Amino acid sequence: MNIKQKIDNLRQEIDNWNYRYYVIYQPIVSDFEFDKKLKELEKLEAQYPEYYDYYSPTQRIGNDINNNFAQINHIYPMLSLSNTYSWEGINDFYNRIKKILNENFVIACELKYDGVSISLIYESGLLLRAVTRGDGTTGDDVTTNIRTVKSIPLKLYGNNYPRFFEIRGEIVFPWAAFNKINKERIENSEPPFANPRNAAAGTLKTLNPQVVSQRNLDAYLYQLLGDNLSSDSHYENLQLAQGWGFKVSNIIKCCKTIDEIENFINYWGKWKKSLPFAVDGVVLKVDSIRQQSLLGRIAKSPRWAIAYKFQSETVKTTLHSVDFQVGRTGIITPIANLEPVLLSGTIVKRASLHNEDIINALDLHIGDQCYVEKGGEIIPKITGINKEARLTFGNKAVNFPKNCPACNTPLIRFQNETAYYCPNYTQCKPQIKGMITHFASRKAMNINVGEETIETFYRAGLVRDIADLYEIKIDDILQLKRWAEKSAINFVESVQQSKQVPYERVLYGLGIHFVGEVVAKRLAKAFPTIEQLSIANNEQLTTIDGIGNQIAQSVIQYFSNENNLQLIRRLKLYGLQLFTIQKIFIDNKLAGKTFIISGIFRKYSRDKYKELIENNGGKNVSSLSAKTDFILSGVNMGPVKLIKAQRFGIKIISEDEFLKMIE
């Protein structure tokens, strides 16, 4: 046997041991024997670098090189699931599927893992890329970190898998590993992770793959996607994937009746804490891929699936005090400080009280015994008070402040709103820092700066508003402690690059109350320049789809403030995009034609197809009518659109047909 064959045999043997240990829990060698073989392979690979293989089991460990996460577009959108906490919701889902399909169907019931969603792309049996959910359209490329998760195969078994496919699942932090790392963090005077989901998410975004490798994350796969799947059955596809080396839970049941579904949910609702990982419900999916395609999707979720969320656990503890926090928009949020208590596997010390109305409804007093639960097993909240246990003296009632806890400005409360606001946004420190953080965020200006750095700049007097970011010089930063020249240069370059961010994102970054991403896009389209928007009246604003009186008044109020107008003049002076760049038609091949885009696409994103339509003289519309010329259809086109298209005689075209039209 030559050296190459010996190395190949060792790799194959260790891959097999990894699979048996991490995926099917059937180890066949001791840890000592495994480590011995791994070291032998490492030694041979070091001696014969010409036989280096990126997919070798020795390459899972990672290295100390930091990497920035690239943004990757999903081939298929990573939709979120509709959810319910009631049997009524399950029955509604089941009956809706029954009515739409009007044929026999099977529901696959699976556990809902409480971790981080991941999309894995394989080509020719090799792991090509791993991407987080992100915003559902675009996610972070975390391939380097995912390679260290030992239950995810770098190279598949057998040869009966599709040449190119995607498989999705959940990265979880098993309870044993989670408890171990929290114990170590406490011993090292580090704050413990709040729960396994947060720990998994934080670990996956760590820039050091070696740290990820040491934390023993696990992965369960639950959906196969691709053009050439072996079976029409979701369940059968998962069983095939298990044979390729993927970890697929055996806790999955194909149900033909509503009673079977309820039995599955009841069983795991009772025994969920016996599992080695956190779960927060059960996912129901129509098993047939064909039927899934017929059912299609709504804006954010598939019609063919729903998540049943387990009811929250409730515990009793003591209220010690209440803090009132100031958010970036000036909203005052009361936070209860509690006697630490174990709730759903985590230590709870704080809970949101949301607003004054809730405090008054609870009749909250310091020292009260409170009933606390986690909404959806995530956010702690006080749901009640044990008034019988309240002392007859010494319990001080919790009263909402009349003045801002940060700047002492009298608070205001708008009509029909439950929140109180601090109106002093130009001088209130938490608002200033929050506004700058929002402005610099990825979805706005995408400036490479975090909350801690903004705090440092604020304390040094470098920033008091968003425009000040554009005045900071490298020399200013180098005067601060622990700042290297390279970091200072990177920050300043990031600020300069933000000047190319389009108008709609600048508008979103201004932080106008009630103006989120979608509203900012609509305003930018209706008013191509900031000057036009600044003089718009209520009537002009409310004629825009999706903009009501509340948003309109907020926009008008913002631009009626001289401080804001002065801020915008400064931003304009610094060269920010405060106008819409008019699109120039590349061609007029689609002139006079209207299109609706529906479904999931393989070659380009929906936004890219919309751009191609407009660049070739066509028009995108949002609703079907007899005047619509074409439906550009991908996978999972909605059944309602299909019915309407047939009624109106609208031509349905594929991606390839569309691309031929604009060649």
Swiss-Prot record:
EC category name: ligase
Keyword presence, Transmembrane helix: no
BRCT domain: residues covered: 585-663
Cellular component, GO, one term: cytosol
GO molecular function, one term: DNA ligase (NAD+) activity
CDD domains the record matches: BRCT_DNA_ligase_like, LIGANc
PANTHER family noted in UniProt: CHROMOSOME TRANSMISSION FIDELITY FACTOR 18 (PTHR23389), DNA LIGASE (PTHR23389:SF9)
Purpose: DNA ligase that catalyzes the formation of phosphodiester linkages between 5'-phosphoryl and 3'-hydroxyl groups in double-stranded DNA using NAD as a coenzyme and as the energy source for the reaction. It is essential for DNA replication and repair of damaged DNA.
Family assignment from sequence similarity: Belongs to the NAD-dependent DNA ligase family. LigA subfamily.
The protein, known as: DNA ligase
Organism (species): Azobacteroides pseudotrichonymphae genomovar. CFP2
